[in-house]
Design a protein with these regions (language model features):
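Active-site anion-handling motifs in enzyme catalytic cores
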Residues: 1-358
Length: 358
């Protein structure tokens, strides 16, 4: 069955690209042709622009991009290479009309994963609901990004989701909200990165030349307390601190920032670090997959994304530590394996239903 995947395949963001890769690979392993929609809306092109001559950006940002261009160029090219080679993203388009036409060349569209239904990111349109498309629609691990729905989100849910044959989301709080509004069953499933096992991720990963004993630091939101925790843990355990940022926007004293790190290197750095310190959802997810020691404070904009994940897979905070520490290496895999199988069964069942019209 020719299946479209509607997600954030354009983002210069480790988690966004790796979840898209995982869903595409999982479908491929089940003999389903999963093709990622090459939709690259104008807001996203502006968001991820590195050229000072890009459209739709302010004068102040043009000046900043001009000063940063050569520093960011190599990092940007690493992401573009992954998008081209691993996601098979072809020529992009930006209009919703072109998206509609493209989706309708497929038998089914999977909306998700990532925060595709967070209108604070995507704007107020219905593109990521595949609105007005004459095609079968399901969602897999879509995220609203919050449990406090705004009026636009409520309106989108009421107007666009009834046409979906099956709906699954990533966070339990989102499922509760959708159930109240739609009065139908909403499944909670894990992010697509959990559809692939450790060995599959190891095959994709690429080594980085670093010291063998290190703490891996990855922030998408500045957090002074979390940084202090990382430095204290590293000092107590004789670890060097390596950090990455997808746009090279930050650099912290006492940390070695690595540049030109793509999604493949990101996986390797998490698996091989002695400890991971992060407020990122996907860095937390990969720390779970690779059973790492984890120092974690949730992102304040959407804390449920990580707290619900850790709770569902039975990972508890170590209360005997001075900082928010989780030793996933000591955790039982029972809950995680149960959630993974539940997620796979949902996806397998809905795809079979769409394929054979059950």
């Amino acid at each position: 069955m020719k299946t479209a995947i509607l997600t954030f395949q354009f983002a210069h963001n480790y988690g966004a690209l790796l979840q898209a890769y995982a869903l595409k690979q999982y479908l491929k392993s089940h003999d389903l042709e999963g093709e990622i929609a090459p939709y690259y809306p104008d807001w996203a092109q502006s968001e991820y622009a590195i050229s000072p001559f890009a459209k739709g950006i302010s004068f102040r940002r043009r000046v900043r991009l001009a000063s940063q261009y050569w520093k960011r160029k190599g990092q940007s090219e690493v992401f573009d290479k992954f998008i081209s080679e691993e996601l098979d993203a072809g020529d992009t388009f930006s209009s919703e009309l072109e998206l509609k036409k493209w989706l309708e060349t497929h038998e089914c569209v999977i909306c998700g994963s990532d925060q595709i239904w967070n209108n604070n990111i995507t704007g107020n349109g219905g593109a990521y609901f595949a609105v007005d498309c004459n095609v079968k629609k399901i969602s897999y691990a879509a995220s609203l990004g919050t449990t406090q729905l705004n009026e636009t989100q409520k309106s989108n849910i009421i107007n666009y989701l009834p046409s979906f044959s099956s709906i699954s989301v990533r966070e339990p709080g989102s499922a509760e909200q959708l159930t109240k509004i739609l009065h139908r069953e909403i499944q909670v499933v894990l992010d697509p990165v959990f559809l692939l096992d450790r060995d599959e991720w190891r095959k994709l990963s690429r080594p980085v030349s670093v010291d063998s004993n290190y703490l891996f630091l990855y922030f998408l939101q500045e957090n002074e307390k979390l940084l202090e925790c990382a430095k204290k843990y590293a000092e107590e355990n004789g670890l060097k601190i390596y950090e990455v940022h997808p746009t090279l926007a930050t650099r912290h004293n006492g940390c070695k920032r690595l540049e030109n790190v793509g999604p493949k290197e990101f996986i390797w750095l998490i698996e091989n670090g002695s400890c991971v310190c992060t407020n990122s959802f996907h860095a937390t997810a990969f720390s779970t997959i690779f059973r790492k020691k984890l120092i974690h404070i949730p992102n304040s904009k959407s804390p449920e994304r990580t707290t619900s994940l850790l709770e569902r897979v039975g990972i508890e905070l170590k209360t005997d530590k001075e900082f928010p520490f989780y030793d996933i290496s000591l955790c039982d895999d029972t809950n995680l394996n149960f959630e993974i199988e539940k997620s796979k069964k949902f996806l397998d069942a809905v795809m079979e239903s769409e394929q054979y019209g059950n």
